[in-house]
Amino acid sequence: MATLERKLVEMLKAPVEALGHELWGLEYIQAGKHSILRLYIDNEKGIFIEDCAETSRQVSAVMDVEDPISTEYTLEVSSPGVDRPLFTAEQYQLYIGETVKVQVTMPVAGSRNLKGTVIGIEGQMLTLSVDGNELIIALDNIRKGNLIAKF
């Protein structure tokens, strides 16, 4: 996770939790002059559109005061959904035995895109079973990780 994203998580975690939600994670996507700040919120009851709207208003107020992003950006708030993104070691731990897709910065076993079963997590190292091979991947090397939904 980049330094700005860490700072944003620290800044926004308490306001989101005050509304009764968990800040599942966030993505800051720079797209030229206009960027996107995407927050994922969750709770045990599920997330409804009203929850997203209320969280958006609260987060906007905090962002206006703190002003951590100097360029224009669009704020998006949503639930993680069934193909939820995974950001932390704790989140990968929740999905041991499940299938995930990860994109890595530095190739692992010759690939930047991997799909496999979460075997375990130790510290900041994720173990995936990919095509029968166990691969160990540093969480810092994961650009993006998502749960693959079962239907």
UniProtKB/Swiss-Prot annotation:
Primary localization class, coarse: cytoplasm
Biological process according to GO: ribosomal small subunit assembly; translation
Keywords from the named record: Cytoplasm, Ribosome biogenesis
Transmembrane segments: none
Keyword Coiled coil: no
CDD domains: YlxS_C (cd01734)
Keyword presence, Cytoplasm: yes
NCBIfam families in the cross-refs: PRK00092.1-1
PANTHER family for the chain: RIBOSOME MATURATION FACTOR RIMP
Recorded family membership: Belongs to the RimP family.
Official protein name in the record: Ribosome maturation factor RimP
Organism: Shewanella piezotolerans (strain WP3 / JCM 13877)
